[in-house]
Amino acid sequence: MAEMEKEGRPPENKRSRKPAHPVKREINEEMKNFAENTMNELLGWYGYDKVELKDGEDIEFRSYTTDGESRQHISVLKENSLPKPKLPEDSVISSYNISTGYSGLATGNGLSDSPAGSKDHGNVPIIVPLIPPPFIKPPAEDEVSNVQIMCAWCQKVGIKRYSLSMGSEVKSFCSEKCFAACRRAYFKRNKARDEDGHAESFPQQHYAKETPRLAFKNNCELLVCDWCKHIRHTKEYLDFGDGERRLQFCSAKCLNQYKMDIFYKETQANLPAGLCGTLHPHMESKAEGTGVQLLTPDSWNIPLTDARRKAPSPVAAAGQSQGPGPSSSTTVSPSDTANCSVTKIPTPVPKSLPISETPSIPPVSVQPPASIGPPLGVPPRSPPMVMTNRGPVPLPIFMEQQIIQQIRPPFIRGPPHHASNPNSPLSNPMLPGIGPPPGGPRNLGPTSSPMHRPMLSPHIHPPSTPTMPGNPPGLLPPPPPGAPLPSLPFPPVSMMPNGPMPVPQMMNFGLPSLAPLVPPPTLLVPYPVIVPLPVPIPIPIPIPHVNDSKPPNGFSSNGESFVPSAPGDSSAAGGKAGGRSLSPRDSKQGSSKSADSPPGSSGQALSLAPSERGRGEVVDLTRRAASPAGAGGQPGFAGVLHGPQDGVIDLTVGHRARLHNVIHRALHAHVKAEREPGAAERRTCGGCRDGHCSPPAAGDPGPGAPAGPEAAAACNVIVNGTRSAPAEAKGAEPPPEQPPPPAPPKKLLSPEEPAVNELESVKENNCASNCHLDGEVTKKLMGEEALAGGDKSDPNLNNPADEDHAYALRMLPKTGCVIQPVPKPAEKAAMTPCVISSPMLSAGPEDLEPPLKRRCLRIRNQNK
């Protein structure tokens, strides 16, 4: 080709070298063979015979000579492409053809008896035997050549191209398109019929009448979907009983759509007049009027007051109510309804509803009424009457009552038992303040109007119909008969009765007349009511002490710690230790030793059961420094604070069960009350203690001297559970706050006394460390103190020097735990001798025991 173009051949030669017709003929032959083979294969799959193709079956439109024919055929194709309503076969073949008057169709047997026409085109119809019973009658060529027929599928007039014999009738088609469509539909119908076995079950005559499409009748049943009207090739044809007939649907989708349509129709028919506009009678398919309001999810939220403002449209449907209930509106007997409702006109709602307009109240769905039906004789224009078990009630009023009932508690909804008395003024059980006006019933407007307008409006509309004796007892009786007051169509609220209104008997209390909108006292409010519930709050409670342990007179139990009383108390009573902030652990150990001390000291020493020692290892001692200085000569109990805080006792306690108990009490006790020694004296006292009672300053007052007010100051205690001297020294670093009151004169323990004290301390420490029971130590101390001589054969047990040891720390269960007093900030330096020297700590238990013993004795003596 390119060479020819290079040679300069004119393009006409190129075009002339492409004879379209021969090539097309070859393609047509191939296509014919392919189409024939494919169609035969497909038909063979479904068990049908092959299709016989003949030479003249492939019709080309370009071969038509007459323009009319071609236009006619083209128009048929165009119209086939558009959706057109199909008529039943009977009308297609018989009546419609007769009316059209085409000569090409005979009405007798449906066969094509058209006269022979021109044989110009030599058209031969395709013979397609779909099923064995219907046979294909190949008409003579003279009959088929150019016959004008009405296509059995598209129902257009055209040249007969194909004909299909269906038993007693022959269908003619104007084109292959129509023929294929008809054959496909017929095939699907047969297939569905064969698979579902509905052919012999149900008569299908109604399909030919209801379906807009062409329904084929071949002495067999048709399976047309009752919803989509299609002939489906499917196994899912579903039977659905609809009254006296059975419906068939090609799929669950169609069935569901049908059900929704029925539901829509029924619901629309049962809606109140205001919610749906003009509706046709109940079972009519769809409302045709333009005023129809579709049932949408919003319809349920439309306030009834808005709906009532529209004049109720005629609804002949049975029952428009959503629930039963005592009807407080115009309850008329069936006879009255039949006679009066014809002329009764619904009263329009007053336009002014300023106070109680309740558009916000959505319709409340309640139980369906017992029986809903239009009373006999009610014309379609009258408001719908709801037949309840208490008589016919106008629908709008019935709906109002349902809403009002939802406001009232359910137990108030019962029928009033005094209904039998027509003369008793009856209050509306829906609203406590609503009742007939004193002057008798007032009509809403025209006395003929039964429409009892909203009970929630400020205009109270009592029923206008007198009580009928035939009404069921559950029906709320209307007010007693009386002359209607047409001049007061809407009695104002002020005319409501003021006296107590009778209520149902099940409510045994009279309700005073309330405003129409005042909620009843038993109104069920859907709001949460906050009820105060007691919430347990943890309150620290002092641990119960041993029977013999009493809180010292000077101590007030404050949770964990005992707050010392005022220093004056300590000075006043020798037995009152007011200045000691005593934790339970202090009391456990120290006071266990002094529990049996004389009554004066017994108050100071809180002896707790040994079992209580196991509590937490950290003791919170909040001391109140009643006086700047601890009880005279109590620096030994002045807690050694790590920090300068006055009221904090830092207890660095080892994890030994005993070390909990080594918390010292700052005693306000009059430890043979002595004046507060100066710094030098304190140093001396410290020296006494460390040096085993080097003689204290001579200035120390006698043990009986009352401690100065400073003596009441509590001391911070540091318990160092380590034996190492450095640790104790660290723990012993006194915060400046606690001026450990100078060691009580201790009667200036002579150096010999420390030895005796050491002996006793050895004894007591042995007992404590071996027995690990402060109870035993307590017993020992109790014995010693009670005998005042010391059952322990301690010569210095009652030694005034031992008693004077204000620095004497309580006997520690373990020798390595030393509690050291904390001096005042100014006297920090003075207290340095009070710190137990490391050599003493490292000297061994015997070196440590004498100071410990001395401390125990001092504590005991102080308690004395």
Curated annotation (Swiss-Prot):
GO terms for cellular component: nucleus. There is a cross-link at K672 (Glycyl lysine isopeptide (Lys-Gly) (interchain with G-Cter in SUMO2)). A zinc finger (FCS-type) spans 142-180, 216-256. GO terms for molecular function: SUMO polymer binding; zinc ion binding. Transmembrane segments: none annotated. Keywords: Isopeptide bond, Metal-binding, Phosphoprotein, Repeat, Ubl conjugation, Zinc, Zinc-finger. Residues 460-484, 733-745 have a biased composition (Pro residues). It comes from the Eukaryota. The modification Phosphoserine is found at S627, S694. Residues 1-25, 304-360, 413-484, 550-616, 725-750 are annotated as: Disordered. Residues 1-14 have a biased composition (Basic and acidic residues). A motif (SUMO interaction motif 2 (SIM)) lies at residues 648-652. GO terms for biological process: animal organ development; cochlea development; cognition; inner ear morphogenesis; locomotory behavior; sensory perception of sound. Residues 314-335, 417-433, 565-582, 590-603 have a biased composition (Low complexity). A motif (SUMO interaction motif 1 (SIM)) lies at residues 618-622. Belongs to the SOBP family. Implicated in development of the cochlea. Interacts (via SIM domains) with SUMO1 and SUMO2. This is Sine oculis-binding protein homolog.
